[in-house]
């Protein structure tokens, strides 16, 4: 009695990782996917490239569409996972990321990219230039 035995061969795909640099300010959101060294650009999209109105550039909706398009472009080029670096304007400007940062991370995940590390790389001043607003600050 000889039964045909089917063996299932697990073919592991080689994972190729990249870095998604997400710059999110209160004026725009830029998603820039590079290789691990950061030297080779794989895909770059911004909120202003996907919406018409200037006021919509920093919105979570624009960030979501830009991230999805960047992810599709990266996956076409063979990227399977990304480490994420989130950046706000920083320095003497705002140190908190804009409204599009979280939406962009979720869109990258939903598009099918594996998410590795999520890191905040906002520049912090070590007593750099004087912030704008004058001696007594911005009075609201």
From Swiss-Prot:
GO molecular function ontology, one term from the record: structural constituent of ribosome
Keyword terms, alphabetized: Ribonucleoprotein, Ribosomal protein, RNA-binding, rRNA-binding
Record's GO cellular component terms: cytosolic small ribosomal subunit
Disordered as annotated region, ranges: 116-140
Keyword flag Oxidoreductase: no
Biological processes, Gene Ontology terms: translation
TM stretches of this protein: none
Superkingdom: Archaea
Similarity annotation: Belongs to the universal ribosomal protein uS11 family.
Cited function: Located on the platform of the 30S subunit.
Assembly, per entry: Part of the 30S ribosomal subunit.
HAMAP family: Ribosomal_uS11 (MF_01310)
Protein name: Small ribosomal subunit protein uS11
Species of provenance: Thermococcus kodakarensis (strain ATCC BAA-918 / JCM 12380 / KOD1) (Pyrococcus kodakaraensis (strain KOD1))
Source lineage: Archaea, Methanobacteriati, Methanobacteriota, Thermococci, Thermococcales
